[in-house]
């Protein structure tokens, strides 16, 4: 066990957090560690050169995008990613803004947004927060660390049932604010994201990086593809796109990394 000075130096925030929230001194007592959803390695498909999304005027960068990490993001890489691609997205967005003429608001888009808000605001029989918790539990139980087709399919059934409850949520904004409404929108988006994640996990019949299948334990060359989910007639459809060949420059960088034989003293994830 490491000394208290070592722990405070290397893990100051964690040391303080456990002390403040659980009254556990991790320099003296063991702490319970469990897997948790930490990072989204999938996301919106963007043009890698300018980070456009296919929607005019909308740019995306960072964790919201598909990213460059593949199936296993290494610690610290997300900071390098946002520095490079955040600048790229911001520069292209700024250049586009400079050249814009007057932009008129779409009354149709505004009316659609109002209709969407009004559809949520009503007295309902289901409170939003417990449904949020139900969704988290579904993803933990059916799309967690180790997955299988049987459990993933059962998860989809539960998500479809949860989705059917969305029209029945109770949303009543008051003088205190619009928290109910925000959570309702968050739940709807989370259900869509969860459904997309599970459907893609069903299609990827292999184990690769953070995606582990008990019924397909090995990496499969046939699965060297990216899975894309999109809405067609209000239904999610999953497509596969072959991965593009890396440039010679990137191939060399990866090959040079593979030549590292001694990992002593290095943090490995």
Where are these regions (language model features)?
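A generic short-segment signal for beta-strand/edge and adjacent turn/coil regions
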Residues: 9-15, 26-30, 181-182, 194-199
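Short loop/turn motifs at secondary-structure junctions and domain boundaries
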Residues: 24, 29, 34-38
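An anion/pyrophosphate-binding glycine-rich loop and adjacent beta-alpha core
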Residues: 1-20, 24, 92-98, 137
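A generic local structural motif
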Residues: 5, 31, 45-47
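Glycine- and aromatic-enriched mobile tails/lids
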Residues: 39-41, 45-60, 64-269
